[in-house]
Amino acid sequence: MRTGADVTSIKRRLLASAAATAVALIGLPTTPAVADSPGQCTYPNKKYEGRPWALQRVLLDELWKQSTGKGVRVAVIDTGVDTRHPQLRPAVDAGSGRNLLPKNLKDENGNEIERGKENGTTDVVGHGTKVAGIIAARPGKGTGFVGLAPDATIIPIQQNDADGHGTAKTLAQAIDYAVDQKAGVINISQDTANAVEPTPLLKQAVDRALAKEVVIVASAGNDGLGGNVKKTYPASYDGVLAVASSDRNNERAAFSQSGDFVGIAAPGVDIITTVPGGGHCADNGTSFSAPYVAAVAALVKSKHKDWEQEQIVAQLQQTAERSTAGPDRLVGWGVVDPVRALTEDDKPIDKPVAGGGMTNAEAPTPAELHMGETPDERNARLATYVVVGGSVLVAAIAGGAVALRDSRRRSRRSAAGGTT
């Protein structure tokens, strides 16, 4: 059994090693597939009373008149989902959950690691619980936070942990299991990054799911500082909707991975969500942008049960808020617009088209965060870990320059009528 000190140690190790692990060669099935945002919260935490900014940008009443996600099952392949949280307990189908972590796990000192429940409803890391909340947290007393698809059902699949015991092989198994459990949408907020050759085993599992008309949403990755461009998997596979992070101004977040594989963006900065044991905290990363998009996919799938997965993806991209005529390497087709996706839906489309759909809407005034953090704690939470020359660096102030550069690039592209 883990003690409080052990859990704290896990979080510290995850913070220190997540980025370094993500750039390792992960073409082999036995290489860890790490969660791409470590987070920094205490569990449980107090409730967030207001309405988070990522929800303020959406007319929720109008959205939910169209769809609440009822009848759609969303698989969260992650570190587990803690059903002790009152907003998640009614959202999770614990009977369909699965724990794919190896048995008899030990840490570097040979001590046994608590594997968790067999149905995937244990989450000592907190990552999967955060992801699930963004998708389908039920309305709760005393908080303005709620999932974007509040009637969708979560299938908890525990495939990874703080020590990186998840592998490309178990990720492939998790995708197959999700399909067997009738998932309509799969969210994967982690990557197996290999610039040389992706893993055939994982690609085959993705293809099987797509053939069953399952929408697969994956985080693009958090190694975007300094203009770094690399493919991440499974996000880069054909048919997978790769999600970048946007900020409150609908610009690419400084850490967000860019590349031709990026299909869309969603809020990923100061994202309020659920944590193990109850309460909420704020976190950053494409890990939390992906479930935002997965939730909208669930809403569309619930409303249009006969639409193919390719048509659902195209609908999200076509109706996204964008400032250029077509896609770019920063935010794909733009920042997802849930209401437009559910209201400009007279007929399905197979592919998004350039030209129309340029909205460039003014971002809403963000709500203040009242999470009881000290300035030092906030700075630590906002820090982004990147790898340069094999060393892990903390970059907390580079984002402004990167965002300005991206904005200038967009202006030049708009004037020239092209994309990057």
Language model region names:
Residues 37-151, 180:
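Active-site core segment of subtilase-fold serine proteases
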Residues 103-113, 245-287:
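Catalytic-core environment of secreted peptidases
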Residues 132-135, 268-336:
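Hydrolase catalytic cores
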Residues 159-233, 279-284:
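Substrate-binding/access-modulating region of protease and related hydrolase catalytic domains
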